[in-house]
Amino acid sequence: QRDDAKFLASIPCSACFNEQRTGKTPTALEVIKLRRLQEERILIITTASSIYQWKEEYETWLGKPCEVCAGTPTNKMKAIGSWTHGLVVSLDSFKETESRSGLVQPILAREPKMVILDEAHKIKNPKSANAKAAFKTKNIPFRLALTGTPAQGKPYDVFSILKFLFPSDFGSYWRFIDEYFEIQDNVVWQGGRPRHFKTYDNFRPDKAAQLQEILNQFSTQRKRKDVMPWLPDKFYQKVKLNPSRDQKKYLRELEETYRTEDIITTGTLDRLVRYRQICLDPTLIGLDGKSPKTEWILQYLKDYPDEQIIIFSKFTSYLIKLSEQLETSWALLVGSTPTKQRGQFIKDFQAGKFKVFLINIDAGKEALTLDAAETTIFTDKFPPIGSIEQAEDRFIASTEEKAHKAHKIIELMIADTFDEQIYKLLEKRKSETDIINNYNQYIKERRKSNGHKSTVPVSGSYQRAV
């Protein structure tokens, strides 16, 4: 990573094409340090589902504030106005379309010194709004593109990244195609009429090597299995989401008493269950309000439409509610799923017949091989830890080829709540009893910090009946 950062920082415009899980984010942030731009405005353009992750990494690695351009139009403009160091914006918010102006102009007006384009393959179509927005950053002095797949489909898909980095050298798409690829004229007959079109799937003689040599001059292209063979089969990404206004209200009321709105809890365990449900989706228990976790999942599915994904939850009711909002193919596996149907779901998922597999943690802890998935999302976790570990192991590779796939486990949590604390306790392999006792202590400390005197029992050990 240090060697890559030094190389990438040595030229004004560069690209990190290293495979997933080789540390492109810290490498990019190290480039900022090496260029001595820590005190300058840095623009980071990424997918909407990654903006908070970038903020956390930026502030951790550089020790400087990083604004997030998200939420309402007012909040986005406020973030741009407060921008002093880092600013993270989604490509969807940044780009201009026929129906909205986007944030290109107000962001560029702040004159950032460097732009990092994450998931740069998303601009592969040079005529798309994504690409046109990226091209407008051409006057930013330092530009860095990040992607593990610079040419996802065809070799010429790399053109837009080249234009983003070197607009004066790669200004014309068709000049690029004519230079490097053999153009073939084709005709098909439709309704008795010919339709002519061109294809250019093959390189001209020696042009593949020439284009590769150009890429080598400004990019790193490392393979995970070559440079990091010690990596574990799976890696974790914690996504901390801000609670909605309604969630803050409900959680605060539960911390102060045993009720919120019309929900009355009857003890510590019941209160903790309701607390977890509110963090997941307030509507699960008949309360108003949005679910930041659901919104994040739906955005992630839009950002990565080609991924096969497993989504785990302890609450079947949430998985059912989530399924009603999915705009892609899915299947639901819970405790009541018949054995025969369960087997068919597994077979179909492995064959790529649907994209999202919704699974109750307790129902999916055994007898499942789902290595077609690259990503698993946990919307919530709760003991026993053994069930969670079994669920995480559903995509252990069944073939040598699949052993080299990146297996990512995303943990969704509501920031600065006990929902976040549960994940920390599970990392220490705490039991259900330990977590409930910690919840009692958490409530006690929260009430104390809020200046409330204790009027309800908030301490004491909980022992689960055996």
Regions found by a protein language model. Give the residues of each.
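Conserved pre-motif I regulatory segment
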Residues: 1-17
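Interdomain linker/hinge connecting the two RecA-like lobes of the SF2 helicase core
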Residues: 12-15, 126-127, 173-177, 183-303, ...
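Conserved Walker A/P-loop ATP-binding site and its immediately adjacent core
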Residues: 27, 39-60, 153-157, 314-316
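Conserved P-loop NTPase motor "coupling/switch" region that bridges the ATPase
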Residues: 41, 60, 114, 131-224, ...
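Conserved helix/coil segment N-terminal to the catalytic DExD/H
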Residues: 74-86, 91-111, 132
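SF2 helicase motor core recognition
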Residues: 96-97, 153-155, 317-323, 342-343, ...
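Conserved helicase ATPase core of P-loop NTP-dependent helicases/translocases
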Residues: 310-312, 320-321, 327-364
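A conserved SF2-helicase RecA2
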Residues: 383-389, 395-466
